[in-house]
Amino acid sequence: MALPILLDCDPGHDDAIAIVLALASPELDVKAITSSAGNQTPEKTLRNVLRMLTLLNRTDIPVAGGAVKPLMRELIIADNVHGESGLDGPALPEPTFAPQNCTAVELMAKTLRESAEPVTIVSTGPQTNVALLLNSHPELHSKIARIVIMGGAMGLGNWTPAAEFNIYVDPEAAEIVFQSGIPVVMAGLDVTHKAQIHVEDTERFRAIGNPVSTIVAELLDFFLEYHKDEKWGFVGAPLHDPCTIAWLLKPELFTTVERWVGVETQGKYTQGMTVVDYYYLTGNKPNASVMVDVDRQGFVDLLADRLKFYA
């Protein structure tokens, strides 16, 4: 039986590819998709969800837009990474359908309420919508199997020296998620920076030759340009968000450790840092499965295999 998931995202090139991977995988049943502000403004990320589902001919999936700003802060966006539209590069179709007439939290709550079994929430942007759901609907916590997030890092940040972008945008929301008591799986930079797509991988995807694989290759063409900056020391581009979906499909590709994670909300230099108690120094009980390594070639092979679904 397919695993029911609810996807909360802020497309974003890697979010878009996570959507492609999820909808090419019969093991997963995508119940709804909600959008958050992050990689671009809330209007643009919502539109990008609709554009991707139009491309994939999955306009049957309910969509709703989420919070327009973080819980306690002003919005920061990553337009320097993802371009003016949030999905610069390919020529994507205009949406042929409209979002639901409700908020992201309302759609999430409805989805959980109506599901016969607990739902896995996959969150690949800031955690604002998920935190609002948890705070406003404590009666639905038991309907959440786990929360799989792309965010954080045990080591270096990518937006500040200490913080990864998604967590930095709304650290208060991320702290609510980590301390919720619901199982959390964290795909942080420690693993996503190893999940790099190289130029030859992009050409492999392009050679598959269907309209979706071509769009994915064009998304990666744009994404690779940003990551050529020598400061990163990358061979390719880290494909952050699809790690969440890949872990659900093939957890054997990943190495995880069980650790306690907290989010720094006050630090002068460390706001948004995910503090991972790797050596069990706090005495706190582990609250997250933290991904620390990935079989890069296996990850690329999984993407290539699933892109053939769209032939």
UniProtKB/Swiss-Prot annotation:
The active site is at 240. It holds the Pfam family IU_nuc_hydro. CDD domains: nuc_hydro_IU_UC_XIUA. InterPro entries: I/U_nuclsd_hydro_CS, Inosine/uridine_hydrolase_dom, IUNH, Pyrim_hydro_RihA, Ribo_hydro-like. PROSITE patterns: IUNH (PS01247). GO terms for cellular component: cytosol. Transmembrane segments: none annotated. Keywords: Glycosidase, Hydrolase. GO terms for biological process: nucleobase-containing small molecule interconversion; purine nucleoside catabolic process; pyrimidine nucleobase metabolic process. Its EC number is 3.2.-.-. GO terms for molecular function: purine nucleosidase activity; uridine nucleosidase activity. Belongs to the IUNH family. RihA subfamily. HAMAP family: Pyrim_hydro_RihA (MF_01431). Hydrolyzes with equal efficiency cytidine or uridine to ribose and cytosine or uracil, respectively. This is Pyrimidine-specific ribonucleoside hydrolase RihA. The lineage of its organism: Bacteria, Pseudomonadati, Pseudomonadota, Gammaproteobacteria, Enterobacterales. The gene is rihA.
